Amino acid sequence: MGRYSVKRYKTKRRTRDLDLIYNDLSTKESVQKLLNQPLDETKPGLGQHYCIHCAKYMETAIALKTHLKGKVHKRRVKELRGVPYTQEVSDAAAGYNLNKFLNRVQEITQSVGPEKESNEALLKEHLDSTLANVKTTEPTLPWAAADAEANTAAVTEAESTASAST
């Protein structure tokens, strides 16, 4: 057992359950509500940079952009492609309320599933368009940005004088 087995169940590392996120992605209203949140100073990045699939707030748009390319996010999206696990699934596995479970699966495949996929496509388009102009890296210190701009200006000036002299 040991002390590390306890860390797996720590509440501060607990993420939102897949069935709740699946419900968020199933309607356009909930997706729009999560994308256009009001400013909240208690959340990272004032609550403006939110990953719906992972249910996480990011500090900056750059952090959100790198998160969307990461393994953790891609794994979470893959988990959300299937039908979420509910009490009905476990009851059907035990042999109870099998008809109720089959009706639920049919409902998901006919109505909720296609709507969720279209919402995910709209979400991807929205994130691509909003994060298209975001740089992939940011300076760690404020004065480093000014130095980096001065260095790039000096390099381009040196290249232009070198090409003009030849």
UniProtKB/Swiss-Prot annotation:
This protein's UniProt keywords: Cytoplasm, Metal-binding, Nucleus, Ribosome biogenesis, Zinc, Zinc-finger
GO BP, sorted A to Z: ribosomal large subunit export from nucleus
SUPFAM superfamilies, sorted: beta-beta-alpha zinc fingers
InterPro entries: C2H2-ZF_Maturation_Protein (IPR051879), Matrin/U1-like-C_Znf_C2H2 (IPR003604), Znf_C2H2_jaz (IPR022755), Znf_C2H2_sf (IPR036236), Znf_C2H2_type (IPR013087)
Example GO molecular function: nucleic acid binding
One GO CC annotation: nucleus
Transmembrane segments: none
Short sequence motif Nuclear localization signal: positions: 7-16
Compartmental location: Nucleus; Cytoplasm
Disulfide-linked positions: none
UniProt-annotated stretches for the region Nuclear export signal-like (NES-like): 17-31
Zn finger region (C2H2-type): 49-73
Keyword Cytoplasm: yes
Family named by the database record: Belongs to the ZNF593/BUD20 C2H2-type zinc-finger protein family.
Function: Involved in pre-60S ribosomal particles maturation by promoting the nuclear export of the 60S ribosome. Involved in positioning the proximal bud pole signal.
Other information: Present with 5630 molecules/cell in log phase SD medium.
Subunit structure: Associates with pre-60S ribosomal particles; released from the pre-60S particle very early in the cytoplasm.
Protein's name according to its UniProt entry: Bud site selection protein 20
Gene from which the chain derives: BUD20
